[in-house]
Amino acid sequence: MDGNGRWANERGLPRIEGHRRGADAVKRALKAAQENGVKIITLYAFSVENWNRPKDEVDALMQLLDRFLKDQLTELVKRKIRLRVVGRYQELPEHIRERLSHVEAATAKFTDYTLALALNYGARTEVVDAARAIAQAAQAGKINPDELDYEQFAQHLYTKDLPDPDLVIRTSGEARLSNFLLLQAAYAEIYFTPVLWPDFDEKQFKLALTDYAARERRYGQTAEQLQG
């Protein structure tokens, strides 16, 4: 979800207006995902580094998030989409935590479609938190460090109940992952587009899926092995 600020700057608008338009793009992405049979969509809404932005922008982002969740609850329930939050949930403002908890509880029964919001998320922070939890479990005798494998490690990630992504879409022309799902995206296909997030619509979503469908996913194997 990158490019909101640049979108606004290019039009001589306040940065928060770019974020508002970005929220509209979220609604389009959810609609496009369902229409194309995408069961789980994870949106990088707020990173641990985003706290370094000007305070007025951070405050405005939190207000926008609160309003978005309030306005979209009925729509999520109507379309049977579960909300799942990944990140350092406990460090968000109290009113945001309460809103998120309410929406998560109201949509918890839905299983066909999931909107995962990465909030106060950072992949490196996630790894540190997982390592800390594993160390505590090992100290308590619940885990044997010598038997630890990736599957066990993954059970301590924020995304422990979500599958690894098949496709990562990076908007705004940036060619990097920016600390997003670094472990989980190890075998994901990555699609880069110059389109700024507020302009990312159903057509752009479909283009990304079409590009993904044309790729050959090898998982370390040769093309000959995949062909049987």
Predicted regions and their residues:
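Flexible, compositionally biased loop and terminal segments
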Residues: 1-228
